[in-house]
Amino acid sequence: MTKKSDAPAIRFKGFSDTWEQRKFEEIAVRSSVICSDDTLPRVEYEDIVSGTGRLNKDIYAKQSSKSGIVFHQGDVLYGKLRPYLQNWLLPTFDGLAVGDFWVLQPQNADSSFLYRLIQSRQFDEVANQSTGTKMPRADWKLVSKTVFSIPSNISEQAAIGTYFTALDSLITLHQRKPFLMKWRTSDANRNQTNRLVL
């Protein structure tokens, strides 16, 4: 169901191709290969900083023999349990997704763009029309049939994904600045105190 769509008013220089209306299932497919290979790192809900797509620990240091869905670098992990928690990850390594994850493999789409698409307001609204009350889960039947407007040119998708990745890195850097300044100040004070004691 690929239909042409109006392109947004603001575009990256050099791109003039049309955008398309495509169902999510035409952009990504779910992997469901289960494995318990002890050599692969495991990613669980508790390992992801909610809403940031960052890991909060060295997952290679974890000891686990749990089974999980195999993912590869370039796949996108989406936490379908309680989707409002925004547990997502664009891994730069191969591993196992343990728990209620969708492992999404891009289809005629750039993985960084797909990663940004699952963070969009439209995707979030659809995913949060979930099933279950105590443990709500995103409904694949609903999400997979939802139509999204995407660039037909994969290079433009990659440019959009790269832009937002750089923006996230810049935001993270600025959020860490006060912490680093405080750390440097306390370290300088500690060094000054040590000099006085000697």
Question: Model-flagged regions — what are they?
Answer:
Residues 1-198:
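Feature detects amphipathic, helix-rich regulatory segments
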